[in-house]
Regions:
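Conserved active-site-adjacent core of cysteine acyl-enzyme catalytic domains
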Residues: 708-817
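Beta-propeller fold detector
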Residues: 110-113, 282, 340-349, 405-413, ...
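Short loop/turn segments that connect beta-strands within beta-propeller blades
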Residues: 335-338, 399-401, 448-452, 492-496, ...
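N-terminal Sec-pathway targeting helices
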Residues: 1-16
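A short hydrophobic beta-strand element
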Residues: 140, 235-251, 372-378, 519-524, ...
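Core segments of small alpha/beta cavity-forming domains
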Residues: 40-99, 104-108, 139-222, 296-339, ...
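Exposed beta-sheet edge and beta->alpha loop/turn motif
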Residues: 241-279, 283
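Surface-exposed, charged secondary-structure patches
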Residues: 16-31, 67-83, 94-114, 119, ...
Length: 817
């Protein structure tokens, strides 16, 4: 009997130890049934600028639209020679070929193939000498193609011929600056570059800038270590200034000696003068990569760590599961069942590199069910897996029971992430019938995921007239063509039902936005659309209406004698100006007013809270009511199941039309149809404006100290000084594009003179001059009546043009290749 009891006791002990060991293993090491993604195979390509590597390029799996891919700018000196370094990793590079295209991609100017690549350490080196006659100060698209065993990988940069741009000096300075920040002793030398302003606020490492203190610039108490070094990427460069972006990774040890990972992005705007580099602007954002194994769980929420406060998140109706996106990764947390799941990530747990950790993609959470399943849309650059190197849109369904993210559909596109993001932020929604709705290339698409088919619901939608609800299940737009032109069309994407709102006779409608699921739109009369002397339109709304999909009016707002302008729609508040007409040309604001959202918050509302700690500074926390059951939930890693269906191919070629692209602070900021608004925006950013053919329309800080244009080369229609846009367009025909810069400052429009473009300037009711030159003290003005050129004081010129309304008209010559 004793032997039996002893044996039973031993078996019980073994069982208990085994159970405890298994539990310990699960909670401390987590269950790493990671994704089925293949490792990245595409090499990286970089430019070697005087022994400093710049402009790291990642491979695309298909040719891209040249005019919608501007990842970097590579300057050319008079030799037009470039050295490229290829990091092949584990791939065999069979050949290197390149082609130079006009930046709109319409014409190939040069193409060559190079088979003999020279091996230098871990890199392959290629020397290129461009033979084409390239125009100065004109961007061209350079496409590089690497022939691999896996196929062809494409790489893109813009090349531009500009003299004395000091590119290698700027790149070397950026590397010196960021490395010095990581060493407290070396960082002491950086103080002269900063413009610190004492605010008393807690350090926020996701928002460091040139006004931060030296201690904050040098990482305060975080004590980080460099994990993945950065390579400078030139975004803008000219004879005076340069803008450079640097991305790298850091690690830091928390109080428990556990490792935190941070993605860091820095922006530098610099000026080279008198053999020294001056820092004009500096911005740094550090964002923590979420790690479910760290101690981030509290009774009332979860700490996401150092990051910006604009969190993409969603909680299910039962308030049992919350999903959130951080640094390109999707996570879900279930406080009640003690689990945290990494639903989707391109990152490798170990032995990763920048190819898998690159965050040129984003995730839109569509739905979180009571069972914890998640529908989401992934869009942007695909770091690895079966779609490696594609820009595209993927629809996923995460099944929590299986712990698998199942790909339902994939749509490749040929525009870069910057442009794709502008469209997908407007609309990306999947209904419960497995239909995906997108805005792409100004078309509203419905994609049937089950049938792998697509249709266009509406063509030619203008972004300014399109609005969608917060969760994207409703949208509305102003119809711009056909029998329904001038109507507002609204759609419920869950039912696919639409309704029309028609204006009364003499009335006009404007879409404004959504409050909850209710449409906000404005009503005005034809005479409320005012046009000033320069042709700029302004709109005053008489009645603002909030209406549900069934047409029930929730709120109607009007103020007799006043017009609603400058409307801003937030989650809980509509803010606007009440304005009066100033003659028949403009509106003048009289006072502000608001409309509150009276809908009560749901019981499962999630709040974003900022907390602070001495080591990490400001951190972001998601606060909710669900109580956690453990301080150490089980961390799970979902597998990814790729679809075996064919890709859904849409026509994503963006229509040819006049557009002005504002680039600033390291990326695409906005797309404008009004060049004056584009210049005003670029001026605030310290950026540039390019047109559709990628000509420089305007650049901040690249104005020569003096310039004189020979009037002999100026078209007669311009010398006549007419500021009638239609007349100018007719006379210039195909030789140039008229650019209306009315509303800009004289200082801004003098850039056009610097670029040898004359500017027509209004001086009175029926008088004008043509600005043909300037120096430090004067403008040089051509009188169309006397046909004489004379100097006029700079301050007097500023005053003269301001009194006439700052009406400036110029033109940019058509490029003939």
């Amino acid at each position: 009997m004793k032997r039996i009891l002893k044996k039973a006791g031993i078996l019980l002990l073994v069982f208990l130890l085994g159970t405890a060991g298994t539990a310990l293993l699960l909670n401390s090491e987590s269950t790493d049934n990671r994704s089925d993604f293949n490792d990245a195979v595409f090499p990286e390509v970089m430019v070697d600028m005087n022994d400093t590597l710049i402009n790291r390029m990642y491979g695309y799996a298909q040719p891209m639209q040249a005019d919608f891919t501007r990842d970097s700018v590579t300057p050319l000196d008079t030799s037009k020679k470039l050295t490229f370094k290829v990091n092949p990793y584990d791939s065999e590079v069979k050949s290197f070929s390149y082609e130079i295209r006009t930046s709109d991609g319409s014409k190939v100017l040069e193409n060559k193939k190079i088979k003999n690549l020279v091996k230098e350490d871990q890199y392959l080196s290629v020397d290129v000498e461009i033979g084409s006659d390239l125009r100065m100060n004109q961007e061209y698209s350079m496409q590089i193609a690497l022939e691999l065993d896996e196929g062809t990988a494409y790489y893109y940069t813009r090349v531009v011929s500009r003299s004395q741009v000091h590119a290698s000096d700027y790149a070397a300075f950026v590397k010196y600056f960021y490395e010095a920040c990581l060493d407290k002793e070396s960082a002491d030398a950086l103080g002269s570059y900063l413009e610190p302003q004492t605010t008393g606020a807690a350090t926020n490492y996701s928002g460091i800038n040139i006004n931060s203190s030296l201690s904050e610039i040098s990482w305060g108490n975080l004590a980080p270590q460099l994990c993945q070094e950065g390579i400078p990427v030139i975004k803008e460069i000219n004879e005076t200034t340069a803008s450079v972006v640097l991305e790298y990774q850091l690690t830091s040890q928390n109080d428990d000696e556990k490792t935190e990972l941070y993605d860091v992005k820095e922006f530098y705007r610099m000026k080279y003068q008198d053999t020294r580099i001056y820092l004009l602007d500096f911005q740094r954002s550090a964002n923590q990569v979420f790690d479910g194994t760290l101690p981030v769980y509290e009774d009332d929420g979860i700490i996401l760590g150092v990051r910006d406060k604009n969190v993409e998140y969603m909680m299910n109706d039962a308030a049992t599961v919350i999903a959130f996106v951080q640094e390109g990764d999707l996570w879900s947390y279930s406080p009640g069942n003690e689990k945290v799941n990494q639903v989707f990530s391109f990152r490798k747990l170990k032995d990763g590199d920048f190819r898998d950790s690159r965050t040129q993609h984003d995730i839109k959470i569509v739905r979180v069910t009571d069972e914890g399943d998640i529908d989401f849309v992934l869009y942007g650059y695909m770091n690895r897996g079966s779609h490696e190197g594609y820009e595209g849109i993927a629809v996923y369904h995460y099944n929590r029971d299986k712990n698998v993210a199942e790909e339902r559909a994939f749509i490749p596109v040929s525009e870069s992430f910057e442009f794709l993001k502008k469209d997908l932020e407007k609309l990306s929604y999947v209904n419960e019938k497995n239909e995906l709705f997108l805005i792409l290339a100004k078309n509203l698409y419905r994609i049937n995921i089950e049938e792998n088919s697509s249709e266009i619901l509406e063509k030619g939608i203008k972004n300014a007239n399109f609005v969608s609800s917060d969760n994207n299940d409703h949208a509305a737009w102003l119809v711009s063509e056909g029998d329904e032109k001038g109507n507002i069309k609204e759609i419920d994407f869950d039912t696919c039902k639409t309704r029309l709102i028609a204006p009364q006779k003499g009335q006009r409608l404007r879409t404004v936005g959504f409050m909850n699921e209710d449409l906000i739109y404005g009503m005005l009369n034809k005479e409320d659309i005012l046009t000033d002397e320069e042709g700029h339109k302004s709109v005053g709304i008489r009645i603002l209406r909030i209406e549900d999909f069934e047409g029930n009016v929730k709120k109607e707002y009007r103020k007799d004698g006043l017009y609603i302008t400058d409307i801003s729609v937030g989650n809980t508040l509509i803010e606007f100006e009440l304005s009066a007409k100033s003659g028949e040309t403009s509106y003048v604001a009289q006072k502000k007013d608001t409309i509150m959202n009276n809908k009560k918050a749901a019981a499962n509302t999630v709040k974003i809270e900022l907390i602070s700690a001495s080591r990490t500074g400001v951190r972001v926390k998601l606060v909710f009511n669900t109580t956690k059951q453990t301080d150490s939930p089980l961390t799970m890693y979902a597998k990814v199941s790729s679809s075996d269906r064919k890709d859904i191919v849409l026509d994503t070629q963006i229509p040819q039309e006049t557009a002005y692209y504002v680039y600033g602070q390291g990326g695409l900021d906005g797309i404008y149809t009004d060049p004056a608004k584009a210049v005003l925006r670029a001026d605030t950013l310290g950026g540039v404006v390019l047109n559709r053919t990628q000509q420089y329309v305007w650049e901040r800080g690249n104005k020569k100290t003096k310039m004189q244009i020979d009037t002999e080369g100026i078209p007669e229609s311009v010398l006549q000084g007419t500021y009638d846009i239609k007349t100018l367009k007719k006379s210039l025909k195909k030789t140039g594009t008229v650019i209306d810069l009315s509303g800009c400052s004289l200082d801004s429009v003098l850039y056009e003179i610097s670029a040898q473009r004359p500017v027509i300037a209004k001086t009175g009711a029926d008088t004008s001059v043509v600005i043909v030159g300037y120096d430090e003290y004067n403008t040089w003005l051509y009188d169309p009546v006397k046909k004489e050129t004379y100097p006029y004081g700079m301050n007097d010129s500023t005053d003269l043009f301001q009194k006439a309304g700052n009406v400036f008209i110029t033109y940019i010559e058509t490029v003939n290749y």
